[in-house]
Amino acid sequence: MGEAAAKRIDSMPTFQVAQVRHGDQDLIIVPVDRTFGKRPPTEQARIQEAFQRSATAAKLPGVVVLVWEDSRGKMAHRAPPTLNDFLKSIDMVYVATALNRTLSLETR
């Protein structure tokens, strides 16, 4: 008795990500829930921008790419069009084995 109560600090959601290099570009591949593909494009963009802001704040260089498993079991992605060929050449198993960082999502 008499001890100060521990101050509760709500932590930010943290995700495992794969920071990889493709050609001369750093990528931060973030696996997200399969329901992500059903969200409106504006919401997808907002979420991707939040991850990009968080990566920048964490000094984690690279373009954020969101990936998820679609209804056919294939990997879908949200990324710049210049990365389409590379992203079509990998799958969720590749992403899972490449996870090498954590990224806390800053919520605003």
Model-based region annotation:
Residues 1-11:
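Short, Lys/Arg-enriched N-terminal segments with co-localized hydrophobic residues
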Residues 9-29:
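Short edge beta-strands and adjacent turn/loop segments
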Residues 57-70:
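A generic structural motif
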Residues 18, 38-39:
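Short acidic, glycine/proline-enriched loop segments that cap or flank alpha-helices
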Residues 29-33, 66-67:
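Conserved beta-strand segments of the P-loop GTPase G domain that flank and frequently precede/overlap
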Residues 68-108:
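Polar/charged, Gly/Pro-rich intrinsically disordered segments
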Residues 39-60:
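Short, non-transmembrane amphipathic alpha-helical segments
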Residues 38, 50, 104-108:
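Non-catalytic accessory regions used for complex assembly or targeting
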